[in-house]
Amino acid sequence: MRTNERAPFRQAVSFDASRFTPHGMMRLFGIETEYGITRDDLEQVDPVVESMELVRAHLTASFERRWDYAGEDPHEDARGFRVSGLQQDKEEDEFAKVDAHRPFSFHEMKSDLVLPNGARFYNDHTHPEYSTPECRTLKDLLAHDRAGERIVQRAAERRNRALGGPHVQLYKNNTDFHGHSYGCHDNYLVPRAIPFSSLMTGLLPFLVSRQVIAGAGKMGVEAQESGFVPGRYQLSQRADFMETDMSVDTMHNRPILNTRDEPHADRTKYRRLHLIIGDANMCEYATALKIGTTQLVLQLIARQAAPAIELDHPVTAVKQVSRDQDLKATVRRKNGRSITGLEIQEQYYTAAEKHLAGSDPETDWILREWKATLQWLTRDRGQLVGWLDWVTKLWLLETFVREERLGWDDPWLASLDLEYHNVNPEQGLYLGLEADGKVWRMTTDADVDAAMAEGPRDTRGGLRGLCVRRFPDQIKSMQWERIQFSGGLLPRTLEMGDLFEPSEVKACAAAFETAASPMDALKAWNNGKESQS
């Protein structure tokens, strides 16, 4: 098992990140995680109700409707057009017919909460979803991702106390092994000046191969034509469910590159890159590599320096890479040549090292760890047990198969796969390894506790959480990019569609920390901006 022979992560990234990296790329990212939910005391489980009850178990007071859905429009396509309908619209209509007979309103079922740390926690119809606040550094993002695990698990514990037993279990994974997949989406703020065609060309090969370092591992294959096929281990939990190169859909016809155009920011300046191909990681190191390497690739695209790799059939390729744990499967390029997923990653690393080395400490940490990980995957992947999820899970399963003398098609292995992702510390296999010191943590308990309490102080996520803590009764509505307050003759709004400069965020937060009311804070903030203009 690999030892931590290099500089600790916490030292390597303890710096003030600037607003922009070279060539206008802003560091701002976040993760949305849909959790699998089960309840073992019922023969038939209504996941809509269970997800709603779980989210509401987080509350210590009655639910108040605050989230404003007016700005959410999944039909806008980043390729420059608006689709008239999505494949998932029909399913949503069917859900609406069923929901009409439930004893809850739409807003009660969604139970949409904005938490004191700036995160969003809500019922995404059949799954509880936790969205981190916007983060500027990997250190903050890892802490907030782990904070999400603890927050949803504490909600489950409260729910179980009400039920009289440990009946509700939550899983940070991406499949129920019955053909249903749920997502872990990574999001990045990108300048709209970068053409979407450039993002498409530069990202597709990278995303096809990213599972080599960021896959969560999966026992079995879920193919639409044959259902669940046991006995085969693969790198990614999501690969089986990818159906097209690009699409605005997310639930059906799932794309490698999602084209939904909901920037949650000033539309004239920014776009939000919404990636749905990623697995839900338990290993903090894998999460750091997943987000960190993607951020570097976006910088390469901004510089027009991404490797020129065009795959013949990306959807086929993502499955081929996933279903070969030896990393030797080749995929076809449009030039007729073949390439492995590992080789694709090596080409992206080489380009990033050439163009980005020395940019800042976090970039150098990502480059160093990216290189080391690719080398270990080539030489001795066993050194990555406790660092990468797919390697760690495979090691656990191999150990179990050997000790219990099982065949690889034994259904017990799929159950172990599931329990690897259980966020209950008393049952989760990964959390058991963590408690035994067998995985490398990049956060401390103090980091996670702090992230549960408040958001990053240099992003609007932290400002959002501050408003929730200071003025909960005066918030009329919220979206990612704005907060509307009540209490005056007319509602007043804090616009955050272009509030990304750390110094501006901190100045705005200072106004809200000291003001007696939101109106006073907005007045002080606006006066401060005018005096500087």
How should these model regions be labeled?
Residues 2-166, 170-171, 204-216, 246-257, ...:
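Terminal catalytic/cofactor-binding subdomain
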Residues 157, 166-244:
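Internal, well-ordered domain-core segments that constitute the primary functional module
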